[in-house]
Each structure stands twice: as structure tokens, then as C-alpha cells.
């Protein structure tokens, strides 16, 4: 899928680019696989803002995507490739031979009419899902589980791909897109291939209004706030921040500071990601 450019009829139009949507074959979603999606505008259950710069945006319906792929040994035909407003990747509508329907993340080069399946005995081809123990070392994979049966949690965004590096006993070494090498249990499932919509990262929004369509609100610089609102605030005119380094609204290092939390699963990291 390519990037579509526009004639510069307005200043924003000059830089704006969109996806060409050549892969999309169906406009309306499958009614049995959608659910209402209530927007939270960055608020938690107490109504307090926990994620800033969220709110508004176009109304969406949630597409129920199958991340578990436990329907083993039942082939499915790809009926359509669809747009999903809730993620960067496209989704594929599957029609299983037993009549069941499901959505999956659409891998790169998956086409309408292709037949895919899941299970330990599935072939090593794009779109098939197998346990890591049944996937050859060196294979490119996505949609990776962290716990067997929980459903895919890693490598799901557009263009993302991981590589199975090695297997040792009950665990496999998987290199993630960040460069981190992580131990994952060999009974966890993964899908063969790379996530589709590779050109997504090259798209330019081009104007503020397009961010608002996506539900992203403006981010105000701390230096133009008052001292009560931000550590950078206050002063006469364009005053310097008055610190050695920039900080967040809560006083934590804003550039170069570590933000990743310590978790019990950190002992599964073989090699840390790129700095």
C-alpha cells in the first residue's frame, strides 16, 4: 500500500499525506463482530485525567479481533481486508470452513482468497498461527503471546515484526522490534509473517484538525504556563526554564529519564532494548 500526496491547495494540504487504501476490499464491518466503544477522554473511573491530551475525535465502533487463534485444524478463507479505526494495522475477515467468522490482524502480503489455519500442525506460511516450539528458528513472527492461552500481546502494530532467535528448554529467545531479546514460553503462540500496512509510519498528518479527528488534543508547552501549573512556568516574557534540564509537570526528568517500571517479568529479558 502506497502513500497518497495532495496538490498544495492550502498550507496544510501541502504536507498532508494519507494511505492509498489499495488493500482495503470491504467498507462496512461485519455486524456480528463489532461492539460499542465509549470514549473515556483520558479519564479513569474517578473522572480524573490520567492521560493528558485526549478527548473528542470521530465516533468509533470496536472490532472484536481474535488474538488467541485457538480454533485448531479448521481452515479459514480470507474474505476481506478492512480498515480498523482503533489500530494502525488493517484487519482481515476470516470465514472458517465450519461457518464461524473472526477478525485477525492482517499480515503483510495476505490476500483475499488465501486459506490459513492455526494449530501445531499448521504449515509455516504467512497468517498461520502456531506454538513457538513448532516454528523454525529464524522465522519472522508477530502477534506473540506472553502467557500460553492469554492471547497475543506483543508485535501487533502496523509494520511490526519479531524474529525467533533460539530455543532453550521450555523457553524461546525472541528479538522484538525494539531490539530487546526476551524469553517466551515455547507453548505461547505466534503468527507467521510481518504485520501489514508497512507505510503507516511514513504518513504525515499535516494539520492540527486531523489530530483532533483521532481524539488527540493540543499539548501546551510548560514555559507558557504559570508557576502553579508547571515547573517551567512563570517569569517575564520568554523566560528560561530556570533548571539544568527540562522536567515534566510533576518534576521528573523529561528528556533521557527512565520511565519503564520494574516488573517481575524483567528477569525474562536476555538483552535490553536499544537505549
From Swiss-Prot:
Coiled-coil features, chain-numbered ranges: none
Record keywords, A-Z: Ribonucleoprotein, Ribosomal protein, RNA-binding, rRNA-binding
Region (Disordered): 222-243, 256-275
PROSITE patterns: RIBOSOMAL_L2 (PS00467)
InterPro entries cross-referenced by the UniProt entry: NA-bd_OB-fold, Rib_uL2_dom2, Ribosomal_uL2, Ribosomal_uL2_bac/org-type, Ribosomal_uL2_C, Ribosomal_uL2_CS, Ribosomal_uL2_dom3, Ribosomal_uL2_RNA-bd_dom
Gene Ontology biological process terms from the UniProt entry: cytoplasmic translation
Record Pfam families: Ribosomal_L2, Ribosomal_L2_C
GO cellular component: large ribosomal subunit
GO molecular function: rRNA binding; structural constituent of ribosome; transferase activity
Alphabetized HAMAP family for the sequence: Ribosomal_uL2_B
Subunit structure: Part of the 50S ribosomal subunit. Forms a bridge to the 30S subunit in the 70S ribosome.
General function of this protein: One of the primary rRNA binding proteins. Required for association of the 30S and 50S subunits to form the 70S ribosome, for tRNA binding and peptide bond formation. It has been suggested to have peptidyltransferase activity; this is somewhat controversial. Makes several contacts with the 16S rRNA in the 70S ribosome.
Family stated for the protein in its record: Belongs to the universal ribosomal protein uL2 family.
UniProt protein name: Large ribosomal subunit protein uL2
Source species of the chain: Syntrophomonas wolfei subsp. wolfei (strain DSM 2245B / Goettingen)
Gene this protein is translated from: rplB
Amino acid at each position: 500500500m502506497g502513500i497518497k500526496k495532495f496538490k498544495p491547495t492550502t498550507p496544510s494540504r501541502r504536507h498532508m499525506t494519507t494511505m492509498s487504501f489499495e488493500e482495503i476490499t470491504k467498507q462496512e464491518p461485519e455486524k456480528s463482530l463489532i461492539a460499542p466503544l465509549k470514549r473515556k477522554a483520558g479519564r479513569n473511573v474517578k473522572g480524573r485525567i490520567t492521560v493528558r491530551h485526549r478527548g473528542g475525535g470521530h465516533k468509533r465502533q470496536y472490532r472484536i479481533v481474535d488474538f488467541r487463534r485457538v480454533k485448531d485444524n479448521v481452515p479459514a478463507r480470507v474474505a476481506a481486508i478492512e480498515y480498523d479505526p482503533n489500530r494502525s494495522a488493517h484487519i482481515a475477515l476470516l470465514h472458517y470452513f465450519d461457518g464461524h467468522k473472526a477478525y485477525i490482524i492482517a499480515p503483510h502480503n495476505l490476500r483475499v482468497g488465501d486459506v490459513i489455519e492455526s494449530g501445531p500442525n499448521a504449515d509455516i506460511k504467512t497468517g498461520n498461527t502456531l506454538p513457538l516450539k513448532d516454528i523454525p528458528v529464524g522465522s519472522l513472527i508477530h502477534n506473540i503471546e506472553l502467557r500460553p492461552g492469554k492471547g497475543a500481546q506483543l508485535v501487533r502494530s502496523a509494520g511490526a515484526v519479531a524474529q525467533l532467535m533460539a530455543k532453550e528448554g521450555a523457553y524461546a529467545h525472541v528479538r522484538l522490534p525494539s531490539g530487546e531479546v526476551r524469553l517466551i514460553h515455547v507453548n505461547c503462540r505466534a503468527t507467521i509473517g510481518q504485520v501489514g500496512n508497512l507505510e503507516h509510519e511514513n504518513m504525515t498528518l499535516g494539520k492540527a484538525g486531523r489530530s483532533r479527528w483521532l481524539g488527540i488534543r493540543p499539548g501546551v508547552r510548560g514555559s507558557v504556563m504559570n508557576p502553579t501549573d508547571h515547573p517551567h512556568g512563570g517569569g517575564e516574557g520568554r523566560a528560561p526554564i530556570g533548571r539544568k534540564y527540562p522536567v515534566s509537570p510533576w518534576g521528573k526528568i523529561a528528556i533521557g529519564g527512565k520511565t519503564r517500571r520494574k516488573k517481575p517479568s524483567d528477569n525474562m529479558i536476555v538483552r535490553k532494548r536499544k537505549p
